[in-house]
Amino acid sequence: MLCFLRGMAFVPFLLVTWSSAAFIISYVVAVLSGHVNPFLPYISDTGTTPPESGIFGFMINFSAFLGAATMYTRYKIVQKQNQTCYFSTPVFNLVSLVLGLVGCFGMGIVANFQELAVPVVHDGGALLAFVCGVVYTLLQSIISYKSCPQWNSLSTCHIRMVISAVSCAAVIPMIVCASLISITKLEWNPREKDYVYHVVSAICEWTVAFGFIFYFLTFIQDFQSVTLRISTEINGDI
């Protein structure tokens, strides 16, 4: 049986595949339409101009929903594990969830407010998504170590921490270099003064984005043992 069909494993699997498709499809359409330079555009650049803006907005909105669903399920898993065998304060898990949901909210802002139309709002959403997302992965990595070896293998903990560390190392120069760019534009010339800042921040942005994707990929095994039950109760007369 396919691993992503067991339990709730389809949730992080769908998040990973859908988000990857969102980035790749938007990039391909934007490049083929001649709206961006094929060499290292910002992720948001590939979702600014129609028709790719519609594709980007729709797919990133759904990615934000899947991200929230994955994080909430992860929160409930850790909560249940902690009740069975105490390894961490519940507040730590709750803070991680709140930061993760704030990051998903930031993704929604990025999806619905294009960078050239409302750059301040768009950039604010991107900052929320990336910073809160990186902190979320760091906190979840710490939780993973605390629950090892009862609930996680040491290799899984190491993988999560490496991804978190790389994402953390990339998000700082991404923000710094992006803040040094004096103008927001889609096409860049290597001779322009801010071109180096653009390239560095774009590399870091793609690194962090796919760092998130690979991180959620590690959740699939944890979600295989989770079952979702929905109960319906009708109160009062109809």
From Swiss-Prot:
Its main location: membrane. Lysosomal modulator of autophagy that plays a central role in p53/TP53-mediated apoptosis. Not involved in p73/TP73-mediated autophagy. Keywords: Apoptosis, Autophagy, Lysosome, Membrane, Transmembrane, Transmembrane helix. The lineage of its organism: Eukaryota, Metazoa, Chordata, Craniata, Vertebrata. Induction: By p53/TP53 and p73/TP73. Directly activated by p53/TP53. Significantly down-regulated in tumor cell lines by methylation-dependent transcriptional silencing. One of its GO terms (biological process) is apoptotic process. GO terms for cellular component: cytoplasm; lysosomal membrane; lysosome. Belongs to the DRAM/TMEM150 family. It is a multi-pass membrane protein. It comes from Homo sapiens (Human). The chain crosses the membrane at residues 9-29, 53-73, 91-111, 116-136, 161-181, 200-220. The keyword Transmembrane applies. It is found in: Lysosome membrane. Pfam families: Frag1. This is DNA damage-regulated autophagy modulator protein 1.
